[in-house]
Amino acid sequence: MQTELSGRRALVSAERLQAELGHLGVGSDVHAGHGMAMVSVWVGLVVWSDGERFWWRTGWNIEHIRPVYAWHPSTEPRRAARRVARRYASLRER
C-alpha cells in the first residue's frame, strides 16, 4: 500500500513537472512504476521523481568516477522546470 501511495505521488509530481516544461516549450514523456516516476526530456536528460524531490544527471565527476546529479523539491515544479529547461538547452547546444 505504501508503494501505491508513494508511486501515485511520484506520478503526480512528474506530471506537474511535465506541464511546467510544456509551458516553457520543452516536450517530454512521463513513465511510472515501482513507486517512482520519470520524465524523459532529451537524450541523456531524464528527471526522476519519488514524489518528494526531482533529480537529474548534470555531468560526470572524473575524480570519483560517478555521475553528478542536481535535485529540486517536487513542491516547486515551476522552478524545477526552469532548471531542467536550462539543462535541456545546454544539451541541445552540443
PLM segments and residue spans:
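Ampiphathic alpha-helical segments that act as solvent-exposed interaction surfaces
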Residues: 67-94
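Negatively charged, low-complexity tracts enriched in Asp/Glu with abundant Ser/Thr
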Residues: 1-38
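Intrinsically disordered, low-complexity regulatory segments enriched in Ser/Thr/Pro
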Residues: 44-74
